[in-house]
Amino acid sequence: MGRGGLASAAPLLLYPRYEVFPTRTVEQAVVEWVPRDMTVTVTASPGKGLEATLDLTERLCAHGYRVVPHLSARLVLDDAHLAEIVARLGACGVDDVFVPGGDVDRPAGRFDSALSLLVSLDQMGHPFSRIGITGYPESHSRIVDDVTIQAMWDKRRYATYIVSNLCLNPAVVRRWIARVRARGVTLPIFIGMTGPLDRARLVNMAAKAGVTDSARFLATHTGWLVRLGIPHGYRPERFLDRVGAALAAPASAVEGLHLFTFNQVRQAEQWRRSLVQRLADPQDPPRAESAP
């Protein structure tokens, strides 16, 4: 592959969003490696609950970051609980949230979907200026395609942007962007991807998340875990080279990159800095490896 696709993606590498899990050590890693003008998103899980997400959000806000917490709908109890969350986030200056349904079989309260929580936020008077929703380039492991497609259509009026779920196949990502636009959904998109990942550390991190969260993580990410484990299965520069032109096309309306760090924050930022520097240096162009 040549440099064209990578060069097209270069502007998106300047200010990607970094997604992290709320763990004991991740705050230090973010503060040490992530520039203060970057956006950090904080996930929510059934095992840790929303409190861990909100706590890390508050601490990262205090460090000067723009933070986007995940408000998983099925972890919110009711409208009173939602109002408390909104007030707490408002107090630390959060104006952007990401609203997934939440990977939990039984809702904790009355919200059974992202749409139901989005409607309640709307009825509260739009307390956040930006709201993100999920897009699925590949089929969801537990939801049929027709449902996810309809859900995006239903949620689009309450959201301001889409974040694509992690997909390591550039051809699938390109086709998905085209399909979203063909359906008349015009929200800007952040494309989900990873930097280089240590597969062993990734599985170990999943194990530390607890039995339930770990089993769900490994079950829902089997495909790209396998891809990470084979030689030349996934290389982030090759991925960007193959999607770069599509991301840069005005019709795609891609706003940025969303880096799933899986808390390998240092590796992600070192990779990003190195690639940005090489793309800016015509004497040292990065090479995207070809497929085996």
What is each of the regions a protein language model found here?
Residues 18-24, 110-136, 186-248, 263, ...:
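Active-site pocket-lining/capping segments in soluble small-molecule metabolic enzymes
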Residues 69, 155-158, 191, 243, ...:
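Conserved, mostly hydrophobic/aromatic
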Residues 76-79, 105-113, 164-177, 199, ...:
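Active-site glycine- and acidic-residue-rich loops that bind
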Residues 155, 255-270:
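Charge-patterned, long linear interaction tracts outside catalytic cores
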